[in-house]
Amino acid sequence: MTNLKLDVLTAEGKTDGQVELPAEIFDREASVALLHQVVNAQLAAKRQGTHSAKTRAEVSGGGRKPFRQKGTGRARQGSIRAPHFTGGGISHGPKPRDYSQRTPKKMIKAALFGALTDRARHERIHVISELVAGQTPSTKSARSFIERITDRRNVLLVVGREDVTAQKSARNLPGVHILFADQLNTYDVLYSDDVVFSVEALNTFINRASGAAQEEK
């Protein structure tokens, strides 16, 4: 495993040095089964699970027998709220439940590193010094800069929490999703075609992730 070097791009389209992507984070073996499991767990945890259908016992009405048991020529019925009646209860319907799955932290980290490795190997990770020049937010400038970096549809922009200029500049851009370094996750990396880090956010992420990588060893 070798560290990958990337150019740091400026808002003016120039190069401002290089950064190293540590091999223990950006050059890992990616397990498709692990990625699938972690993404499924992540999406499941987003579900509210508040769905609820009423059974025949919970539907209002239906307390009396609709007609006598014998002599009518019809099939016997005990309640108009049985599941086969219009307006009746639901049989085997959904009830409130917790969809979250327990996923070990090591698996979550390994999946994230695997997803970032895939993006790095396909040259879909980019590093910028700043999204727009100066301290004035500009959606037009941000859009132009991102389009120069990549022509793909979905872009994940990882910036520092203090970088308000970048956040305001990119928050209304279609296809651009903004995250902070401590929010980076497997699903958003895989959903995005390209990942664009600011230098500040990349350093923050590497410092956090390097500790996790050392713990795995």
Swiss-Prot record:
InterPro entries with a match to the protein in the record: Ribosomal_uL4 (IPR002136), Ribosomal_uL4-like (IPR013005), Ribosomal_uL4_dom_sf (IPR023574)
One GO CC annotation: ribonucleoprotein complex
Pfam families referenced in this protein's UniProt entry, alphabetically: Ribosomal_L4 (PF00573)
UniProt superkingdom: Bacteria
Residue numbers spanned by region Disordered: 46-102
GO biological process terms on file: translation
Keywords assigned by UniProt, alphabetized: Ribonucleoprotein, Ribosomal protein, RNA-binding, rRNA-binding
Disulfide bond residue pairs: none
Claim: Cell inner membrane is one of the keywords in the record: no
GO molecular function, one term: rRNA binding
Subunit and interaction comment: Part of the 50S ribosomal subunit.
PANTHER family recorded: 50S RIBOSOMAL PROTEIN L4 (PTHR10746), LARGE RIBOSOMAL SUBUNIT PROTEIN UL4M (PTHR10746:SF6)
Family: Belongs to the universal ribosomal protein uL4 family.
Function, in words: One of the primary rRNA binding proteins, this protein initially binds near the 5'-end of the 23S rRNA. It is important during the early stages of 50S assembly. It makes multiple contacts with different domains of the 23S rRNA in the assembled 50S subunit and ribosome.
Name the record gives this protein: Large ribosomal subunit protein uL4
Classification of source organism: Bacteria, Bacillati, Actinomycetota, Actinomycetes, Mycobacteriales
